[in-house]
Amino acid sequence: MNASGNAGATADDHRPTLEDARAALSRHFGYEEFRPGQEAIIQAALMGCDSFAVMPTGSGKSVCYQLPAALFGGLTIVVSPLISLMADQVRALKEAGIRGSFYNSTLKPRVRPEVLRRALAGWYDIMYVAPERLTDPSFQEFAAQANISLVAVDEAHCVSQWGQDFRPAYRAIAGFVNLLPVRPPVMALTATATARVRTDISQLLELRSPVMQVTGFDRPNLRFVVLELRPKERERWLTGYLRTHPGDAGIVYAPTRKKVEQIAASLCEQGVLARAYHAGMSDAARDEAQRAFANDDALVLVATTAFGMGIDKSNVRFVVNCGLPLSIEEYYQEAGRAGRDGEPADCYLLWSRGDIRTCHFFIDNIEAEGLSGEERQRVIEGKERLLGEMIGYAMSSSCLRRRILRYFGQDVTMLSDGCGNCSVCDGETPQRYLSDEGISSRRSADTRAKSDPAAARVRSLREEDDFPPHDDDEEVFERLRTLRKELADQQGVPPYIVFSDATLRGMVRRRPRTAEELSAVSGVGKVKLERYGQAFLEALK
């Protein structure tokens, strides 16, 4: 630790600078500029200050702590509830040239001491930690000896009982930080938090004058559709939708384990590469399902809402909720799994009035471990209010995007005439989709990008370079996807970790012929250029 008491740097004249961070951004991730909000949060970490980032899913929150971790000499602790994702996150770090590890209940007891020993020896830049581990005496003993340069709290809304994913174990974070010999800067990150939840997070994490960045909640590449359909009609609709979207990866959410199994089995019978995912499955079965989906061996994952945050696959093209979520936060988290690569994606809510009874049942039987009876009642009342907002969204006759953004407190004056990219604004109805075959032919993403104002904005933002389209663009894109899958299987990583769909699209548009030209494609960093560059250049010939 340094004499200044800030674990994030050794001394003022040796602090990593923002220019160092920009160079690391290009080297590790292949991006030349920070995304909105990233610069201020990274600067705060480099200066040893606390920070709080509220940024949309897919906007690069993880880079906010990954870059400082790559520059600091110590260890960055990332507290995360996403145990099922940690192994993939560590693999992604390795692909980017950053040393990572994780510490959670999936590690065998005999392995845990070795992981901590290596961390003390300086083997890692980042360690992902489940919140439950923070109260483990052996981990606390390790932390007291470690050179911890930053504590990042991912999915920070989990600390608030007013948030949609309250996790009592998150309440231990502030105490853990206070036990450290020297307090490092603390960084809180979330994609969905109302003003009330943000205040709660700051207080419960005991953030000290944090640098705050709320970049907005809008995801202009996502198209929102609400269809009021009875349960039996939903499966018929889903079958038709998948028939018109062959090759697209997507997530289907269902409210119960039984319904998950039923939908997954039905899809498999129809030849769809689908997997079920829910808490009633064994750890091995869940891991297999998640791995198959991440590796593109399964195109559709049918899951209970417990899976809501547990996927980091960037090229999910659709999310379908077969039932009413308990809150707008929960719905936006789940819908936000779609289109993380910035490409157009669809978010469907299929619901009926009967879903409201199911939601009330879930709320009345909520688990509230560690809470008193009075606290539990407050949680239930809060959940009822959140459900009321969700019902209002489902029944809305005004712009769906505007309703979501207003709920999170964002200025919506720019949407006074509607977004042009939701079922209310573009006049979509169930009848337009349902037909004798189950669904009518829907516009393609490319067609929609040309005709819908919101999708057109996405396209204009994405295509900062002016490269004319080629007749064989889709053929070349599929060739690159096939190569990516082969390389990913060889490396034992999910395909999206090699390159995202957006990066492959950039290659297709630019048609680079040299390593230098390939490095100009957004998402191609030095590490990946050296590892995969030649193979992709050959495929582009």
Where on the chain are the PLM-derived regions?
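Accessory DNA-binding and partner-docking regions appended to nucleic-acid-acting proteins
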Residues: 1-21, 357-358, 363, 367-376, ...
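Short alpha-helical segment immediately N-terminal to, or the first helix within
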Residues: 44, 321, 393, 506-507
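Helicase motor core with emphasis on the C-terminal RecA-like subdomain
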Residues: 10-15, 19-28, 32-36, 40-62, ...
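Short alpha-helical "packing" element that flanks the helix-turn-helix/winged-helix DNA-binding module
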Residues: 38-41, 390, 504
